[in-house]
């Protein structure tokens, strides 16, 4: 159906619009400028009301494609009316000689509420200045109405010439559509474009469009499972669907997607899949534009919940409404990938047949298929595995698994035609195949491959095989978790986890994960570890704890995979405890003996400890870019070594002292360019926790930093370093210790707009604090980030020395940055005396915000508590901070009423009800002559 044949008059009364315009032109004395001024409110009202009506109808019927067509129709009528006015009243002689056409996406008859309007003004070969003025009349009014108009004014000859050399222009003209004006010009352009540009250039166009698609994917994020996807440009988004249609239209000369069924390119069910995907993606995109009031293409967390509500998604047990919506989105993105493979396979087959004469014979001879050793079911076609016969899966469904296994061991790509048949054969994967011993043996071989198991698993997942073969995995395919911590869907996270394990297994991750690489060759149950890594989050999205439910799921699957009883118990334990090591390392004081003994009681064996460390590394690394950093690696290594000593019978305070002495000696030796007196002085400054936790390279850096500060007689100094691992900048602060030091440092970071990812708190034997703050990186270039870090360090120094007033800075800088969060996390405070023999442990969990850590540490100081150590941990938008505290007498807080008061005050801060605490922050507490007399906030061994 032609666009003009559609009737969307329920969103615009065209006759009424024209009558309102005619009234303005009845006054002959008006100048053009005055006429334009009078027309603007009329057209602005028509556009606004029409779009609002389109939004109401989208809410009512849910059809995204109809909404996009309504807005396109509305835009057509506005442009047509403006053009008619130019013809009738402004340039009656020349305006009728031009044509106004839509091109690009608008030419297809679809338009998102905030999208650009791409117009082509066609002029006859002999044109006049007034024709150009008529174009300007329409254009200027559209611009004055606030539309973003992409436009070109050309003759047909110019269009043909330019489209031959410019692929962007060629693609735009491919979907040219007459809106109004001299239709013969548009018809002539379409005919000449087909005969002079399209004919014989199909392969060239296809190659260009696919290359353009790949480049676009790399820019937008080369996975369709990013949890904040770009709906227009991202993988599996609208542009991918449109690229498919452009290619099909160009090569097959079709006018409509339905024509691809007649040509045998798509089946009827695949056409339905195309139309459903198109409709859904348009619904999402239109809602995004309506909700944000602009051409927003990124489906960010801020708007996901609102869009889920607008599209009428409801929560289900284990999944919120927004998570159900996003799962639907990712499943649609996967469908788009399936359709891409199907069309590409058909095109390749068609192109091979279309090569004429001797060239075709030679081409087919050069590209003949080759046998694959050991396989009669599959053949090699130009480095890709292809089917030897079309019925290979029907004859033996095990071949659906064998295909990927043979591709893996022979390092072959998958032929798109083979993938098309796989997609159409998924119904063959039934319970009988799932229980088949050979199928499970092949799958386990794929999973534990020494080559690239993640690549093969991802191919299986993209083809739909993985989720069908392991239905429990199928339940988490395309599932997102509505938080800022996880960057990928659950299935993509699990596959990436296997990829990290493979890197460790092959020894290619030595620099990033030295301990994991060292331990991996000694792991006795390699198969069990791979299974545990693949399945550790398989029960996400259920009402019960996913670790417990996942262990239960894994027990059944291990039997299917024919693992031994011992292997099964190992997998079950690893999945049940897969969060344990990460949480202990990041939220507990690793120098508190009870932390280690409690952890060792749960682990019980060295083999489990090795495997749990490796699983933890894989899990954190696969969460997303910037989540893993060197500090987390150091925490995990410290926990491993402490637990190893205990499990092997070597854990004692003596051994800790010996190890600390060895570390002290290593620092002494590393300062070989210093004199002995200076080496002895500075190596004696540090206590055991520092020596056993901080890497030697950092100890050397800190010691040189301290000596330089002493030479310059600086009581206060900061040092900045950007790390090679992603998204972290380190600021080290040397200052005399003080009760509110940590609060003021973190407050200064908040005032500077720096988000703290972690903090290391140490005190030296001469009463100074050596605190290292890790802040999230803001700039990609090291020089820019170093400059920014130095500015944060300078602000810390100015606040501590009294040059800047922190309360006002926090109040002005953080409040202006705050906005309503897309997330809600109920504040939680847990106070325990059972986690440490010496300290009361306060653990807080809440929504992160600028200045939160400063507020919490201020409250703790205000409550007359000493912070002996702290673990600052952020998981996306959620923060879990743990403080090891005593009262001013060095005792645990045991009084129930006092514990309740602490919890109440901290919850008030987390709910932003205690900003007045900032007013009581001291000003200039550090750089005073009598600073040494100030009370210590942290014991010497903090």
UniProtKB/Swiss-Prot annotation:
Its EC number is 2.7.7.59, 3.1.4.-. The gene is glnD. The lineage of its organism: Bacteria, Pseudomonadati, Pseudomonadota, Alphaproteobacteria, Hyphomicrobiales. PANTHER family: BIFUNCTIONAL URIDYLYLTRANSFERASE/URIDYLYL-REMOVING ENZYME (PTHR47320), BIFUNCTIONAL URIDYLYLTRANSFERASE_URIDYLYL-REMOVING ENZYME (PTHR47320:SF1). It catalyses: [protein-PII]-L-tyrosine + UTP = [protein-PII]-uridylyl-L-tyrosine + diphosphate; [protein-PII]-uridylyl-L-tyrosine + H2O = [protein-PII]-L-tyrosine + UMP + H(+). GO terms for biological process: regulation of nitrogen utilization. This is Bifunctional uridylyltransferase/uridylyl-removing enzyme. Modifies, by uridylylation and deuridylylation, the PII regulatory proteins (GlnB and homologs), in response to the nitrogen status of the cell that GlnD senses through the glutamine level. Under low glutamine levels, catalyzes the conversion of the PII proteins and UTP to PII-UMP and PPi, while under higher glutamine levels, GlnD hydrolyzes PII-UMP to PII and UMP (deuridylylation). Thus, controls uridylylation state and activity of the PII proteins, and plays an important role in the regulation of nitrogen assimilation and metabolism. Its cofactor is Mg(2+). Uridylyltransferase (UTase) activity is inhibited by glutamine, while glutamine activates uridylyl-removing (UR) activity. Gene3D superfamilies: 3.30.70.260, Beta Polymerase, domain 2, cca-adding enzyme, domain 2.
């Amino acid at each position: 159906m032609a666009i003009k044949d559609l009737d969307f008059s329920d969103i615009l009364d065209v006759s009424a619009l024209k009558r309102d315009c005619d009234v303005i032109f009845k006054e002959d004395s008006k100048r053009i400028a005055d006429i334009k001024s009078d027309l603007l409110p009329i057209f602005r009202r028509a556009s606004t009301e029409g779009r609002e009506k389109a939004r109401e109808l989208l809410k009512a019927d849910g059809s995204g494609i109809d909404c996009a067509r309504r807005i396109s129709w509305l835009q057509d009528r506005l442009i047509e009316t403006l053009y008619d006015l130019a013809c009738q009243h402004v340039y009656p002689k020349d305006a009728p000689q031009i044509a106004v056409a839509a091109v690009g996406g608008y030419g297809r008859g679809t338009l998102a509420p905030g999208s650009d309007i791409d117009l082509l003004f066609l002029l006859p070969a002999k044109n006049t200045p007034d024709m150009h003025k008529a174009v300007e009349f329409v254009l200027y009014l559209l611009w004055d109405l606030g539309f973003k108009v992409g436009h070109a004014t050309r003759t047909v000859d110019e269009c043909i010439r330019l489209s031959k050399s410019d692929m962007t222009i060629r693609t735009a003209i491919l979907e040219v559509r007459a809106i109004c004006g001299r239709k013969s010009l548009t018809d002539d352009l379409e005919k000449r474009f087909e005969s002079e540009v399209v004919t014989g250039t199909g392969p060239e166009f296809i190659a260009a469009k696919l290359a353009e698609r790949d480049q676009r994917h790399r820019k937008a994020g080369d996975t369709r499972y990013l949890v904040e996807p770009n709906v227009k440009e991202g993988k599996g988004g609208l542009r991918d669907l449109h690229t498919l249609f452009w290619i099909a239209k160009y090569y097959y000369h079709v006018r409509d997607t339905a024509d691809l069924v007649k040509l045998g390119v798509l089946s009827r069910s695949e056409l339905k899949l195309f139309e459903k995907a198109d409709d859904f993606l348009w619904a999402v995109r239109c809602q995004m534009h309506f909700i944000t009031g602009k051409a927003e293409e990124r489906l960010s967390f801020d708007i996901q919940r609102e869009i889920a509500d607008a599209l009428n998604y409801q929560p289900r047990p284990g999944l919120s409404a927004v998570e159900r919506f996003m799962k639907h989105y990712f499943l649609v993105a996967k469908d788009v990938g399936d359709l891409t493979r199907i069309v590409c396979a058909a095109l390749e087959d068609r192109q091979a047949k279309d090569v004429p004469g001797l060239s075709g014979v030679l081409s087919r001879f050069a590209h003949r298929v080759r046998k694959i050793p050991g396989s009669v079911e599959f053949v090699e076609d130009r480095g890709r595995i292809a089917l030897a016969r079309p019925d290979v899966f029907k004859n033996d469904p095990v071949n659906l698994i064998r295909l990927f296994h043979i591709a893996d061991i022979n390092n072959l790509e998958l032929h798109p035609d083979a993938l098309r048949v796989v997609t159409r054969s998924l119904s063959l994967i039934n319970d009988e195949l799932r229980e088949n011993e050979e199928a499970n043996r092949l799958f386990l071989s794929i999973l534990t491959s020494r080559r690239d198991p993640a690549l093969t698993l991802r191919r299986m997942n993209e083809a739909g095989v993985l989720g069908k073969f392991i239905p429990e995995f199928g339940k988490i395919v395309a599932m997102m978790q509505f938080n800022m911590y996880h960057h990928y869907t659950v299935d993509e996270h699990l596959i990436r986890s296997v990829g990290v394990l493979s890197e460790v297994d092959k020894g290619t991750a030595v620099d990033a994960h030295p301990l994991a690489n060292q331990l991996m060759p000694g792991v006795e149950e390699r198969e069990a570890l791979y299974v545990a890594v693949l399945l550790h989050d398989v029960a996400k999205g259920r009402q019960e704890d996913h670790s417990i439910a996942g262990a239960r799921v894994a027990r059944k699957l291990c039997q299917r995979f024919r693992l031994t009883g011992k292997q099964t118990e190992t997998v079950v334990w690893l999945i049940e405890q897969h969060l344990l090591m990460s949480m202990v390392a990041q939220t507990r004081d690793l120098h508190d003996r009870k932390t280690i003994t409690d952890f060792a009681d749960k682990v019980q064996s060295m083999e489990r400890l090795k495997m749990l460390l490796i699983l933890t590394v894989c899990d954190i690394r696969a969460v997303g870019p910037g989540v893993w950093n060197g500090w987390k690696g150091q925490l995990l290594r410290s926990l491993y070594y402490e637990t190893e000593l205990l499990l092997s019978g070597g854990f004692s305070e003596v051994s800790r002292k010996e190890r600390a002495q060895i570390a002290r000696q290593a620092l002494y030796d590393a300062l070989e360019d210093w004199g002995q007196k200076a080496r002895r002085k500075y190596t004696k400054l540090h206590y055991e926790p520092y020596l056993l936790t901080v890497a030697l390279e950092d100890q050397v850096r800190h010691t040189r930093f301290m000596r330089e500060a002493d030479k310059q007689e600086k009581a206060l100094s900061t040092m900045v370093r950007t790390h090679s691992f992603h998204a972290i900048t380190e600021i080290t602060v040397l200052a005399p210790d003080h009760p509110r030091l940590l609060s003021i440092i973190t407050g200064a970071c908040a005032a500077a707009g720096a988000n703290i990812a972690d903090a290391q708190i140490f005190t030296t034997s001469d009463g100074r604090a050596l605190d290292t703050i890790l802040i999230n990186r803001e700039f990609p270039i090291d020089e820019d980030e170093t400059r920014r870090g130095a500015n944060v360090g300078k602000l810390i120094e100015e606040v501590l020395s009294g040059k800047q007033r922190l309360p006002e800075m926090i109040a002005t800088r953080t409040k202006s940055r705050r906005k309503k969060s897309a997330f809600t996390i109920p504040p939680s405070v847990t106070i325990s005396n059972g986690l440490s023999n010496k300290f009361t442990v306060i653990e807080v969990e809440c929504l992160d915000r600028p200045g939160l850590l400063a507020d919490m540490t201020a409250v703790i100081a205000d409550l007359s508590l000493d912070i002996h150590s702290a673990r600052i941990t952020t998981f996306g938008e959620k923060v879990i901070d743990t403080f090891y505290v005593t009262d001013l007498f060095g005792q645990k807080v045991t009084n129930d009423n006092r514990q309740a008061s602490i919890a109440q005050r901290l919850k008030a801060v987390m709910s932003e009800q205690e900003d007045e605490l900032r007013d009581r922050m001291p000003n200039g507490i550090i750089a005073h002559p009598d600073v040494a007399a100030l009370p210590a906030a942290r014991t010497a061994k903090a």
